[in-house]
């Protein structure tokens, strides 16, 4: 396809497919990634080893992010790339129950992250392309992911408590096969004319607005990575069970629903920059509270802040990256944005694994809250001076 926008009727026909794609990929997170670090600990790995696995996976995802985005921009075949990545990830997931050593877990995590990254990047780029000028309505389609996560995480904790965590892997494989089949229903994306991709890319990432954006995302996502990777382990260490982990994760997703649904109107009212800035303050509050909770059940209430923290950040950041990119580098920009989050995950995996072992989970969360507040200050001081081009 060449550089023409999708017409309204064409977009209306295909946008519901993206909602199902979000549903399946986040249902996969609900049954797998929510409990993956708990599974590692149950296999005898230490917090530092879990952190190193997270580092390796994030390194792989960071390298893959730009590759998948650039490949999609050049070929327009996001649907085939997503489907192929999902099938590969489902096959790799089935190998996890057969592995028992740290080094094999490390290798699997690298391969798994490489292929799953394609879906996370390209589903966003595809949805934004289909929305066209209505990109602020992205949240209404991403809402499918919140629903998928709620249904999966709410049931998975109770089920795994009875049948064992090993069953998360075949469950994930089935979900990702459904994702792959759904992805094949999408159209090819437009291939926008324009050479000199490298020069355009260099100009984009040298913008002061992009540099500040990437720095603040890095600081917040380093902290977010700690809460993702170690909240479940913290709940366990405080006496909670798999069901409580599932309930806490479910409440975070439930809190997303109204924010996802109304994110378009809220973004129009607040603006991308103010929404992104506000999210950093809520992340400071949310992650700081993890560091002071006296009982694991407090995680349920704290996770209600997921709406104004995670939803505000993700939806505004996806649009912010898209806004700064030229037409022929939209998927590449999403890849670079997610490469930044993966770089943060690399640092966060090692840093949080070390802090968990050395200073405990409470102090770890407090340090991470400071990182979020630093991002809030930096972005607040510069958001008006350095605006996206």
Residue ranges and their predicted role:
Residues 23, 92, 102-120, 218, ...:
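Hydrophobic core of transmembrane alpha-helices in multi-pass small-molecule transporters
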Residues 80-94, 173, 274-289:
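Structural signature of the two symmetry-related core transmembrane helices
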């Amino acid at each position: 396809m060449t550089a023409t926008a999708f017409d309204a009727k064409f977009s209306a026909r295909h946008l519901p497919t993206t909602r199902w794609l979000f549903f399946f990929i986040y249902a996969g997170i609900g049954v797998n990634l929510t409990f993956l670090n708990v599974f590692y600990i149950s296999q005898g790995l230490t917090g530092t080893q879990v952190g190193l696995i997270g580092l390796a996976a994030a390194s792989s995802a960071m390298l893959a992010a730009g590759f998948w985005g650039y490949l999609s921009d050049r070929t327009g075949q996001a649907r085939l790339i997503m489907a192929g990545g999902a099938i590969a990830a489902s096959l790799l997931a089935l190998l996890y129950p057969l592995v028992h050593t740290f080094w094999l877990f490390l290798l699997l995590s690298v391969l798994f992250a490489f292929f799953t990254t394609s879906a996370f990047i390209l589903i966003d780029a595809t949805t934004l392309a289909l929305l066209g000028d209505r990109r602020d309505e992205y949240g209404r389609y991403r809402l499918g992911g919140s629903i998928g996560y709620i249904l999966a995480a709410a049931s998975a904790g109770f089920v795994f408590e009875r049948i064992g965590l090993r069953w998360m892997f075949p469950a994930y494989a089935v979900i990702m096969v459904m994702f792959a089949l759904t992805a094949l229903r999408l159209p090819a994306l437009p291939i926008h004319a324009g050479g000199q991709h490298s020069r355009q890319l260099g100009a984009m990432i040298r913008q002061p607005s992009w540099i500040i954006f990437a720095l603040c995302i890095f600081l917040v996502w380093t902290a977010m990575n700690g809460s993702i990777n170690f909240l479940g382990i913290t709940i366990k260490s405080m006496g909670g069970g798999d069901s409580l982990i599932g309930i806490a994760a479910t409440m975070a997703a439930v809190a997303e629903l109204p924010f996802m649904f109304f994110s378009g109107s809220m973004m129009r009212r607040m603006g991308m920059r103010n929404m992104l800035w506000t999210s950093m303050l809520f992340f400071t509050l949310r992650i700081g509270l993890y560091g002071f909770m006296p009982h694991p059940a407090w995680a349920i209430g704290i996770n209600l802040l997921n709406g104004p923290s995670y939803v505000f950040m993700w939806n505004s950041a996806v649009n912010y990256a898209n806004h700064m990119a030229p037409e022929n580098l939209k998927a590449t920009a999403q890849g670079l944005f997610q490469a930044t989050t993966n770089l943060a995950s690399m640092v966060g995996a090692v840093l949080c694994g070390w802090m968990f072992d050395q200073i405990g989970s409470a102090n770890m969360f407090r340090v991470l809250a400071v990182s979020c507040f630093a991002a809030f200050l930096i972005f607040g001081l510069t958001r008006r001076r350095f605006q996206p081009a």
